[in-house]
């Protein structure tokens, strides 16, 4: 039996760019999620879409007065995944979204969501909130990628945002495949696994825990052209205020298929140590190419 909902109002925050099909797929789930609350708003920051995303979002806002769409032209180019430029850009987008949220009436809870995930368990999110430990400031999703032809093998999604309590900042950028397996193992054992940071496609926040926070890009000392995931410094600030962050096992997100070659699937499933070594080589070559 589901615990009674202790929080009455929610705002769902989304970033959107060229994700029309994902919005069409997840729109009913987002609205169902909001239906568990007495009051809600959905805030979307959209930029530079060319696939009909902008028009779809504005149609959504026309049919639902609780949807707020902030569209703008940014003309940003493709940036290296971990580069300071890309993380700074993502931090700016998330701060713009936070600014839009703060202009609304105060809500109990803020749910940040990657709208391009394949799907998510609505009841899992609600249960994750209603059954959370009293000290929670952020509850992150148990996000998974599925390997093609290996549906029983789950690959942890969004390892870049993950930082365990027994790790320091330096660890967040290295051995991500090994750390992803560690996260998966620990989440399987704990209904709420305490972390310094994670995301997994959905983050649920107490409004009071983030009302004065902002996202930022923090450079790596060893590789100053790269930055930590913008979620990590944001989540560490929540902990500094006396809250606790958790990954909720029940709050499952299906991020879709991990599109890799069959031989890579074999390595990931049966030879993880070899795969980790190849990833290190690949990461080194990738960074060399972006210099």
Regions picked out by a protein language model, each given a short descriptive name:
Residues 60-107:
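Active-site-proximal specificity loops/subdomain of glycosyltransferases
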Residues 1-32:
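N-proximal low-complexity "stem/linker" segments adjacent to membrane-targeting elements
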Residues 117-217:
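Conserved catalytic core of nucleotide-sugar-dependent glycosyltransferases
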Residues 22-24, 51-59:
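Acidic helix N-cap motif at the loop->helix transition within catalytic regions
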Residues 105-118:
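Short beta-strand-to-loop acidic/aromatic patch adjacent to the donor-nucleotide binding site
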Residues 9-11, 41, 233:
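Cell-envelope/extracellular polymer assembly enzymes that use nucleotide-activated donors
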Residues 45-55, 74-76:
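A conserved acidic beta->alpha catalytic loop
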Residues 184-291:
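C-terminal catalytic/acceptor-binding lobe
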